[in-house]
Amino acid sequence: MSHDIKRIVSHYRKKFNTNDPFVIADQLGILYQIGALKYEGCYMFLKNHRYIFLNEDLPPHEQKLVMAHELGHAILHRKENCYFIRNKTLLLNSKNEIEANKFAIELLLPDEILNDYIESEYTVEQVARITGYYQKLIELRLKA
């Protein structure tokens, strides 16, 4: 199933007037918990409820990125359980992981901010350093 991720993200950003994945999850009734995990995060669909779990050892900025990624799974792949493993997920060619990454970076790096960087002629590497997001995610965002 193909998703128009830009349109979907825009819908939720406008509906809830935020790009904060924690607020959007709250508004959608998606429960999340931060605790000790062996991986960065995971999304689970159990007994018709959606849950996101985040690793407590991640810095807040990375928790927000992982939350946005898992929120992407919750919205785009509602009934599939997914685990976020940093070093592998960003390199996987899995359609679901790529879509969740696109959802996350589309949500966290809106057009107006990205366009400011482009107009100022920042390189992808510079945008990654400024925003704190992986360079591969910035590249993925620019392809959107």
PLM features: residue spans?
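Active-site hotspot residues in diverse enzymes, especially metal/ion-binding acidic/histidine motifs
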Residues: 1-144
